[in-house]
Regions:
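Active-site HxH/HxHxD metal-binding segment of metal-dependent hydrolases
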Residues: 54-163, 251-261
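Metallo-beta-lactamase
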Residues: 45, 52-53, 145-147, 154, ...
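Short, hydrophobic/aromatic-rich segments at coil-to-beta transitions
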Residues: 20-26, 159, 168-170
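Conserved beta-strand hairpin/beta-sheet module of binuclear metal-dependent hydrolase folds
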Residues: 13-63, 184-195
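Accessory terminal helices/loops
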Residues: 1-9, 123-127, 135, 221-230, ...
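Short, basic/low-complexity N-terminal boundary segments at the transition from targeting/disordered tails
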Residues: 1-18, 138-142
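Short glycine/proline-enriched coil/turn segments at helix->beta-strand junctions
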Residues: 42, 65-68, 84-90, 187-189, ...
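Short, basic/glycine-rich phosphate-binding loops at helix/coil junctions
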Residues: 37-41, 133-139, 196-199
């Protein structure tokens, strides 16, 4: 692990850092507390996602560690890789490259970072993120500056082992929320970083870049087989108990066996179907079952 450091100076407005223990840190970033994670090894630090790119995440990370930073993106949505420009090219599943190229640009983030009329919104269309009306990035009438468009990502393959020095993490291909979503498994602690495939409020499988319910079901079974000790999601509530996997698996299984959700307005006022069971909700496109 990294050596003991003096107390950290104050954080930038809107960015918080939480020490989760065992060399794992959580950074919540604007506009609505997107979740990034830092895993410290003896030689390197792995940063999982970079947020929307508001403010300088790197500046805050450097208050925690001076280790070289390796960045990996769980998927290509702008709220997960908008801050990539501050780091060396990120590792990413090749199936996400087209998503990243279209959605993580500065221009896209400037247009897309607020709630959309007619449905829950905020970047990525996640529920409960962004106030009703207005723009979650506005600060007294001014929008904060965003990081520029990041460099092209570097491919990472399913099963890749990333050695941080005395600590190895594994990359798992887990399509569902998007075609190329990945999870990161910390073998030292059993922690599983799940991106947006597992969420406390709602999992979305309705966008043009989403996989299918069948993809998600298969990925959830793979996650469960790891017997993780804790799950860390890309959105609040960000720390989840592994038992939520069982409930989400059953929810997806019911959809695969004919259950139908209720119509719901989503991103941009579009319509999707929302199916809830055992406190888990999957919001999906009827054409994305299999």
């Amino acid at each position: 692990m990294d050596e003991k450091r003096p107390p950290r100076p104050p954080m930038q407005k809107g960015i918080t850092c939480t020490d989760l223990g065992n060399g794992i840190y959580n950074f919540a970033t604007p506009p609505v507390g997107f979740q990034q994670y830092l895993i410290l090894g003896q030689e390197k630090a792995l940063l999982i996602d970079s947020g929307m790119g508001i403010g300088s995440l790197r500046r805050e990370i450097e208050k925690v560690t001076n280790l070289p930073i390796v960045l990996i993106n769980t998927h290509g949505h702008p709220d997960h890789c908008g801050g990539n420009a501050e780091f060396a090219p990120a590792l990413m599943c090749p199936a996400e490259f087209d998503v990243y190229e279209k959605m993580a640009t500065l221009e896209y983030r400037q247009k897309d970072s607020g709630p959309k009329p007619g449905g829950p919104g905020g970047p990525g269309g996640h529920p409960g993120e962004g106030p009703k009306g207005g723009h979650p990035m506005e600060d007294h009438g001014k929008r904060p500056e965003l990081q520029p468009t990041g460099p092209a990502p570097v491919p990472v393959e399913d099963g890749a082992q990333i050695d941080l020095g005395g600590r190895v993490v594994e990359v798992l291909y887990t399509p569902g929320h998007t075609h190329g979503s990945i999870c990161i498994f910390d073998k030292l602690t059993g922690s599983l970083f799940v991106g947006d495939n597992v969420m406390g409020e709602r999992v979305s499988v309705y966008e043009w870049n989403s996989g299918t319910i069948e993809d998600l079901h298969r990925s959830l079974l793979r996650m469960k087989a790891l017997e993780p000790s804790k799950l860390y999601s890309g959105h609040r509530p960000n720390v989840l108990e592994p038992e939520i996997l069982e409930r989400e698996i059953r929810c997806a299984d019911q959809l695969l066996n004919g259950a139908v959700g209720v119509p719901q307005k989503v991103r941009g006022g579009a319509m999707a179907l929302a199916y809830e069971a055992e406190g888990v909700c999957i919001c999906y496109d009827e054409n994305k079952i299999r």
